[in-house]
Regions:
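FAD-binding core of flavoproteins
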Residues: 1-66, 70
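Alpha-helical interface subdomain recognition
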Residues: 48-184
Length: 184
């Protein structure tokens, strides 16, 4: 039970407006009837669940990236500066295309990971690319929105925060890159 001696749960808000918890176990005694499997044999089952959860997070991130790109493209098409839409400037068009390419590549790897869920490296590749693409799309989205992108009034900031949190859950880019390197 969660109120057993040695279990400490600390809840806290995350940057994306949700909540998370930190669970600390210290010399927790478990009754024999509560043991789910053989001693020291749980890691493969836990890893399988985490791999599947990573693919689901990548799917959520794909949707967030899609919306972030659409919001940004719409903003630069409609925001006028110097008497014309800022989206008419070629350098901003190139940045928007980079965002689109990153989003599409990440989505493709997510689809591949979902289709090959039991292959040992499919979730790592998707999670690495999702983290890289999410960071690029979030940062570019904020930049292309200008100072307004940092305010709570513009939804792009929320998507950047959510993409940042998704990257951190179940291991960030660096964690999954190292794990992928060990597999291959």
């Amino acid at each position: 039970p969660s109120n057993s001696e040695g279990i400490k749960l600390r809840s806290y808000p995350t940057i994306d407006g949700l909540r998370a918890s930190e669970l600390t176990l210290n010399a927790v005694k478990v009754d024999q009837k509560d043991i789910l499997g053989a001693l020291h044999q749980a890691m493969p089952a836990i890893q399988q669940v985490v791999d599947r959860a990573c693919v689901l997070l990548c799917a959520e991130a794909a949707g967030a990236m899609d919306t972030a790109v659409k919001l940004t493209v719409d903003y630069i098409k409609n925001r006028e500066q110097f008497g014309q839409a800022i989206g008419s400037f070629q350098v901003l068009q190139h940045r928007a295309v980079e965002m689109l390419g990153a989003k599409d590549f990440s989505r493709a790897l997510t689809y591949r990971a979902a289709g090959a869920i039991d292959q040992s490296n499919s979730s790592e590749r998707a999670k690495v690319e999702m983290g890289r693409s999410g960071k690029l799309i979030g940062q570019e989205g904020i930049q292309l929105h200008g100072g307004m992108g940092m305010t709570d009034d513009m939804p792009i900031g929320h998507f950047f925060k959510r993409l940042t949190m998704i990257d951190a859950i179940f291991g960030n880019v660096d964690f999954h890159r190292k794990r992928f390197a060990q597999i291959i």
